[in-house]
């Protein structure tokens, strides 16, 4: 076994993370392009696509978060040279992806239907429902794509997903233009056209990734047969993956509830709040991408029973993610005006956003911290802690505190949106502390098992 080198591990982690980060940026940018191009078409379509996206993401991540655990399984099994285990894991997650697609589609349809009862403008409602239905048509394919992406991630083969995601972004722009504005003899579809474009692209990249898997000779031994998965194995897969999906769902819904609760504070306040959240989501594509790579590295070292490398990669990954987050935070703080002006020229919105900027820097630092810790714990297959910690931090600490500070005078004068951001920051801080404590306990237990092997 080669001697562990901090510098070599850092280089490998960065090299491995880069394609994952690019993939995540490309997928995030697709949603941004949908919103921008719909906004240029009509204000109603902008509102509808924004609303539709806020419905889509929380429901989708419930399934997505469940199947990304395949990467940790494959990394561990590859390290143990367990080809049959890898084949079975791929079969289980593919089967699970298809099964989960059904409730995801039903939930999307149900929520879009429930919008009819909350007094939304009829025209906006029609576009929103059409956009969500279009996205729902691509759910099975995007789930299958993410299964194969996670599978390849576990094998540390990440470039093909990066190329496909980048290609999807490039294809998204002309297809959106054709379908939104009704070119090449097609009718104008507005925001609904953006949803149809996304569904088409999701189907296309899923087919491309399946073809890549089937054509690559090294992966022939991993091809699953067409028999049904073993019941006990499938249930185990579900119980490992589902808490991971619930953790992402809890976070997304938490942010949505904050946005809804803050809505009475006015349009400028909500605009500033959404700009801040958008900035944090862009930052997360970087730190979250590294965290996804860390999950694989940790799973691999556990499979090799290499306690020295396991300890080393945990320390390096946390230091790397927090260092990057700190640098980004400093840049955002000192160039806040420039960043915010990219989103708006409304002076009222800019002033409100500038008042939030320090809290945003703290938010993204603690968010990066919890991303790193969650990534490591996923590598340990401890997904329950990844779920329970944010459930406590966000819902039992962050949300109540934010509500009290923002909308009541129980502690101090009403702080408005800044009060909600104090709640966001404290919720993430508590989540990060809990995850750190859990990690230290899990790490000691894992090291003890590796030593006793």
From Swiss-Prot:
Gene that encodes it: norM
Phylogenetic lineage: Bacteria, Pseudomonadati, Pseudomonadota, Gammaproteobacteria, Enterobacterales
GO BP annotations, alphabetical order: monoatomic ion transport
PANTHER family referenced in this protein's UniProt entry, alphabetically: FMN_FAD EXPORTER YEEO-RELATED, MULTIDRUG RESISTANCE PROTEIN NORM-RELATED
Family indicated by similarity: Belongs to the multi antimicrobial extrusion (MATE) (TC 2.A.66.1) family.
Lipid bilayer topology: Multi-pass membrane protein
Main localization (coarse): membrane
Protein's job: Multidrug efflux pump.
This protein's GO CC annotations: plasma membrane
Subcellular location: Cell inner membrane
Pfam families: MatE
InterPro entries: MATE_fam (IPR002528), MATE_MdtK (IPR050222), MdtK-like (IPR048279)
Keyword RNA-binding: no
Segments traversing the membrane: 13-35, 50-72, 93-115, 125-147, 160-182, 192-214, 238-260, 275-297, 318-340, 350-372, 385-407, 417-439
Protein name: Probable multidrug resistance protein NorM
Superkingdom of origin organism: Bacteria
GO molecular function, one term: antiporter activity
Keywords noted in UniProt: Antiport, Cell inner membrane, Cell membrane, Ion transport, Membrane, Transmembrane, Transmembrane helix, Transport
């Amino acid at each position: 076994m080669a001697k562990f080198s901090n510098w070599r591990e850092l280089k490998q982690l960065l090299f491995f993370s880069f394609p994952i980060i690019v993939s995540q940026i490309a997928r995030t940018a697709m949603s941004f392009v949908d919103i921008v191009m719909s906004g240029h078409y009509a204000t109603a379509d902008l509102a509808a696509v924004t609303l539709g996206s806020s419905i889509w993401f929380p429901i989708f991540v419930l399934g997505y978060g469940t199947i990304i655990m395949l990467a940790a399984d494959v990394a561990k099994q590859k390290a143990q040279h367990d080809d049959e285990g890898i084949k079975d894991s791929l079969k289980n997650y593919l089967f699970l992806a298809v099964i989960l697609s059904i409730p995801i589609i039903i939930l999307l349809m149900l929520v879009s239907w429930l919008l009819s009862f909350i007094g939304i403008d009829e025209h906006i409602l029609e576009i929103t429902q059409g956009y969500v239905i279009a996205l729902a048509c691509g759910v099975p394919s995007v789930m299958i794509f993410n299964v194969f992406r996670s599978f390849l991630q576990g094998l540390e083969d990440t470039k093909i997903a990066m190329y496909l995601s980048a290609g999807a972004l490039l294809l998204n722009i002309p297809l959106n233009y054709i379908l939104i504005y009704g070119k090449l003899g097609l009718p104008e579809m507005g925001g609904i056209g953006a949803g149809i474009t996304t569904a088409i692209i999701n189907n296309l990249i899923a087919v491309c990734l399946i073809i890549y898997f089937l054509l690559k000779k090294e992966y022939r031994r991993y091809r699953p047969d067409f028999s049904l998965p073993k019941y006990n194995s499938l249930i185990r897969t579900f119980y490992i993956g589902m808490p991971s999906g619930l953790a992402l769902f809890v976070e997304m819904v938490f942010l949505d509830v904050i946005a809804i609760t803050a809505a009475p504070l006015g349009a400028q306040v909500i605009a500033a709040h959404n700009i801040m959240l958008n900035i944090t989501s862009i930052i997360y594509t970087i730190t979250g991408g590294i965290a996804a790579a860390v999950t694989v590295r940790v799973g691999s070292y556990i499979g090799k029973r290499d306690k020295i490398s396991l300890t080393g990669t945990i320390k390096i990954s946390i230091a790397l993610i927090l260092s990057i987050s700190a640098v980004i935070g400093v840049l955002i703080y000192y160039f806040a005006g420039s960043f915010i002006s990219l989103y708006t020229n409304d002076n009222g919105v800019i002033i409100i956003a500038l008042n939030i900027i320090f809290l945003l820097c703290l938010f993204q630092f603690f968010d990066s911290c919890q991303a790193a810790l969650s990534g490591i714990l996923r590598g340990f297959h401890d997904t329950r802690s990844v779920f329970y910690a944010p459930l406590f931090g966000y819902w039992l600490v962050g949300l109540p505190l934010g509500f009290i500070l923002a909308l009541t005078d129980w502690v101090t004068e009403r702080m408005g949106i800044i009060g909600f951001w104090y709640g966001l920051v404290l919720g993430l801080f508590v989540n990060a502390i809990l995850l750190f404590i859990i990690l230290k306990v899990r790490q000691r237990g894992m090291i003890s098992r590796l030593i006793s092997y």
